[in-house]
């Protein structure tokens, strides 16, 4: 079984040559506002626009800044509003089955704190740094120091929302995962772990 690890690791998919995400397609309430926010706040660049047949809406593509990864947005003339806890992440962090809970962007660990301050300076409401800790079962460890952590914190995260209410995350891996990180059986639809 493969594991997630910091960029540049040697994990290989031998089944398919998946090179990353081509794009992720989301739905915008207001295309103009959405494009402006992603360009002005996150620095992405609009690279492709199209009108959908029959006046149904629009489909726009933004490049994340590396010429490869992108985010696309649909705008539909009669799209229903998102529902927290169903199509959007609810106040308790849950969302419905088959929906996207949040979108995490990989950022350099050495720029993590700087990027949080940069978002705040742009008027974005950002959470405190969440240091996901093994010793706290994924819970938050309030203080993080790479020199003294000893591998307890596995990812650092900050969360914020785009104009459509989509929860976004800036995340940086702080350790490479190994076999010791695979300690839980997956739950079934009934909430019980699968037995071997």
Locate predicted features.
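Vicinal oxygen chelate
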Residues: 2-5, 19, 31-32, 86-88, ...
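A detector for short, charged/polar N-terminal pre-domain segments
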Residues: 5-16
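Core segments of cupin and vicinal oxygen chelate
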Residues: 27-79
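Short glycine-/small-residue motifs
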Residues: 70, 167-170
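Short, solvent-exposed loop/turn and secondary-structure capping segments
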Residues: 171, 180-183
């Amino acid at each position: 079984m493969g594991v997630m690890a910091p960029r540049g690791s040697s994990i290989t998919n031998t089944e398919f040559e998946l090179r990353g995400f081509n794009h992720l397609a989301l739905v915008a309430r207001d295309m103009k506002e959405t494009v402006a926010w992603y360009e002005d706040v996150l620095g992405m660049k609009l690279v492709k626009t199209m009108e959908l047949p029959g006046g149904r809406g629009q489909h726009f593509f933004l490049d994340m800044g590396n010429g490869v990864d992108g985010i696309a947005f649909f705008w539909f003339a009669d799209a229903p509003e998102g529902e927290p806890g169903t199509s959007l992440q609810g106040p308790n962090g849950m969302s419905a089955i088959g929906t996207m809970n949040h979108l995490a962007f990989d950022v350099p660990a050495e720029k993590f704190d700087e990027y949080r301050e940069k978002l705040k300076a742009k008027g974005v409401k950002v959470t405190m740094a969440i240091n996901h800790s093994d010793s706290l079962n994924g819970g938050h460890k309030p203080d993080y120091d790479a020199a003294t952590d000893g591998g307890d914190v596995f990812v650092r995260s900050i969360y914020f929302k785009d104009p459509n209410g989509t929860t976004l995350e800036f995340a940086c891996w702080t350790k490479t995962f190994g076999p010791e990180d695979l300690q839980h059986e997956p739950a079934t639809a009934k909430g019980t772990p699968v037995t071997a």
